[in-house]
């Protein structure tokens, strides 16, 4: 599909690999977040550093940090790594939401291209013929919470002067909630995907409809 219209035939495996590529980028983002936060602020004290002759590099090595912070005032007030993490969480949820939307669309009664196990669905309260894709819809909905967490952090930080301000205690609850929701969705999605079945006959019929091979014919 392109712009929700039949476009060109591809294998289902090719489509699944497109989902894989999105998640690979998410993994790369998380790895970069790990690099960015692997800086030891110890020794910055309240804001102006410590007068004691500590060996910060030795302490960093002992604690497993890759490097030390360069400026004590920045180290005390820096929450870039929290925002980076929240952004990575948001992108994971955006990708899971897009996957969910495609599943919901394909399960549409007018298309019925795929189906998932009933464990991830519910029936209707008054329409017994319906099979509602609850888990994909809930994952799609949770995406808004992750984006909201990122927005909350950015708004929290935008007006803060250097160095530490008590406002910063709010970042813990925000990022912990975001992480919790992302982990729950990442736990559910693969369990859902392994139950996915494709109606091969219908997929083959779609591949022949609406001149979807027109581009290949023109190229030929």
Specify the residue positions occupied by each region the protein language model found.
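Internal glycine-rich alpha/beta core junctions
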Residues: 8-156
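Active-site pocket-lining segments that scaffold enzyme catalytic pockets across diverse folds
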Residues: 5
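Glycine-rich cofactor/substrate-binding loops
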Residues: 110, 129-220
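Conserved small/polar residues in nucleotide/adenosyl-binding loops
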Residues: 1
